[in-house]
């Protein structure tokens, strides 16, 4: 006879497993590029057609400007913005778009002009590219707390009610940033740790004080420093700079965060900061495109439109299986937009609008098509389709197949730099003016 108590336990366990998986994959988009940091959504009903008036659940203005992407947990949507010199943390309601709270965390200026003085002095402080400002790092949440980071190094943790739990400044604590085009790396949350990366000009070729690139972890609840690891590379000057966010990789026996920048791809233990492996000599200059993973292979672009390289990782250890890259591809590679992988294929978009599809295993190019416009937003993979959004707010959707097929072109009518977020079959896009939720309106 079946034990009813045991049956209840088994049923409860099954429900918990299903619920946990559903909440994590379909409801929440907790960080930049989503739950796995790879811009892949499990949604089956994400819209493919919309306009500035059609198939829009809501559209709300966002004060100021920013390049950060929204993060989502349940009915909470978080974003950052810079309004003049005010650095703002914002919370919106997912179903209505209502701005639930706005917190001025600090003030700062996105300096555009280099420092004048002796040769090399302009490298001793950061300046910002005209396309972005201090609100470039995206927020991250674990469902209880949310972390905001700004380009001047201001780091703050709040609860969902908007109470600030702790604040600190990376430049004040760790030294002045020497990043050529403005700090933009997004933070991560791993267990009870907030992990930040700073990759910057070492100033090694100049006389005087030097600068370090580093990873640093803080307790999520208290802001207490837990570990700090210097990230050493052989890069020089601007080549040291990297604006990328690490990506998680969970091998059978090892969880690691993988970073591209400083002409180097490497991995670290997120619990301790220990470096696990590195690949040097990936020369290409300063790096904006972050790595992505598809089927135990890391794909990364070597700096400014450098080769796209594929590094195979062992399924158990997570270590590279070979000294050299499995393959590399050099034509029309991206300078800003991250690769995205799905179903054994890799998709990239160059800054000037060449969309391409490659075989993830051997680098075979299946198609290379110019789809129009200039791009900074990273593409999204969802339900057998790839979403490419250009600076003018035109989203071109293509089939994620070996044959180039355009599904739709959608016009938002506002400029877009930020990468999209997905939750409950709705697409959230942050434009230069607004936050837009694309999909069927929610019922009251």
Where are these regions (language model features)?
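Ala/Thr-enriched low-complexity intrinsically disordered regions
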Residues: 4, 19-22
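Bacterial N-terminal signal peptides that target proteins for export
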Residues: 1-10
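Bacterial N-terminal signal peptides
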Residues: 9-19
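Noncatalytic, solvent-exposed loop/strand surfaces
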Residues: 21-444
